[in-house]
């Protein structure tokens, strides 16, 4: 705590504003908000997506001039939360940089102050090193390169797909967490720093994506705009995720599969560019092979068709509430 208090008392020329999206994880949220407000940030925006666990009441009890709380009337999902959160941060604080993360994540003590001390010349995006509370690397937040932009990585990824190790073809290795900084193409929204001017240039995160892939799509779009995105291993975040879903053959509830499939195609369209027509049939085949894991096969296949249609049309065909009703 003394180190945190020291960093909070220092004055920085660069204005950093944090954005947190929360939903029914009050105890985690308390840790995240406390960690941010102990740092030299110019502002904090919390978007609470309709929590019913006391989060809203706790947020209302806080008194800090740097805090702005947004209480949407309906659940906007992580993507929608970051969209309105980024917008509010830009309007309320006119920052130089934004940093975002979910309510079950938080910056390690001194992380945000350390970011403000970095040489950020020529950089528009940065990813922190994200760890589980036990100190191991958080796999879901491991930054990556886009294999479609790097021939060697594309070959490595294709070979890895044949052996079930495709992630290793384009995600950073453990050794990169011991280096100074690494240029990357994409990263998650846990400990993601974006220059405010870049946000104004490429636009806000796409709220209609709701969940899954919105962070990868956004950071890939940042890179496609010509901006530089780097991994900063010295800036540490902690992600206290409750579950690791790797290896699960079936996505439940079913509506989550819709977002995973549709947004996956949106992501591949951004990542693959001219290669997308070759990637599309491969992804569709993987969906068809997965049908054996779903008891309601007709409903699952209807979901696949809806996800394909929406991805190709580039617009949602129904509301989140309707999706939940169709695919419980």
What are these regions (language model features)?
Residues 25-38:
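Short, well-formed alpha-helical segments that are part of the catalytic scaffolds
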Residues 35, 48-57, 74, 105:
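A conserved acidic beta->alpha catalytic loop
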Residues 60-80, 88-92, 123:
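Conserved donor nucleotide-binding strand/loop of the catalytic core
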Residues 94-104:
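Short beta-strand-to-loop acidic/aromatic patch adjacent to the donor-nucleotide binding site
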Residues 110-147:
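Conserved donor NDP-sugar-binding/catalytic core segment of glycosyltransferases
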Residues 167, 174-194:
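A recurrent flexible, glycine/aromatic-enriched loop bordering the glycosyltransferase active site
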Residues 186-187, 191-194, 198-204, 208-235:
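A short, conserved alpha-helix in the catalytic core of glycosyltransferases
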Residues 255-260, 273-328:
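Non-catalytic, C-terminal membrane-associated alpha-helical segments of glycosyltransferases
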């Amino acid at each position: 705590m003394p180190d945190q208090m020291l960093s909070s008392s220092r004055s920085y020329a660069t204005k950093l504003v944090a954005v947190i999206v929360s939903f029914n994880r009050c105890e985690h949220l308390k840790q995240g908000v406390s960690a941010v407000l102990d740092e030299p940030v110019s502002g904090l925006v919390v978007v609470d997506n309709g929590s019913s666990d006391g989060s809203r009441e706790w947020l209302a009890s806080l008194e800090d001039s740097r805090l702005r709380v947004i209480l949407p009337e309906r659940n906007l999902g992580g993507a929608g939360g970051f969209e309105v959160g980024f917008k509010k941060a830009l309007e309320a604080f006119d920052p130089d940089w934004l940093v975002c993360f979910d309510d079950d994540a938080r910056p390690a003590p001194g992380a945000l102050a350390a970011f403000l001390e970095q040489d950020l010349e020529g950089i528009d995006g940065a990813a922190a090193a994200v760890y589980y509370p036990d100190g191991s690397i958080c796999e879901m937040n491991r930054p990556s390169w886009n294999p479609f932009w790097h021939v060697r990585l594309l070959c490595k990824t294709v070979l890895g797909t044949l052996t079930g190790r495709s992630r290793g073809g384009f995600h950073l290795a453990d050794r990169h967490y011991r280096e100074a900084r690494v240029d990357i193409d994409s990263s998650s929204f846990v400990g993601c720093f974006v220059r405010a001017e870049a946000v104004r240039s490429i636009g806000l995160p796409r709220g209609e994506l709701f969940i899954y892939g919105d962070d990868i799509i956004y950071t890939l779009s940042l890179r496609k705009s010509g901006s530089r995105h780097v991994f900063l291993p010295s800036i540490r975040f902690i992600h206290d995720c409750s579950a690791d879903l790797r290896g699960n053959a079936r996505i439940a509830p079913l509506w989550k599969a819709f977002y995973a499939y549709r947004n996956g195609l949106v992501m591949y369209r951004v990542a693959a560019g001219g290669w997308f027509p070759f990637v599309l049939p491969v992804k569709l085949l993987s969906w068809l092979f997965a049908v054996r894991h779903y008891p309601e096969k007709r409903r699952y296949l209807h979901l696949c068709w809806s996800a394909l249609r929406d991805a190709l049309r580039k617009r949602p065909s129904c509301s989140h509430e309707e999706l939940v009703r169709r695919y419980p």
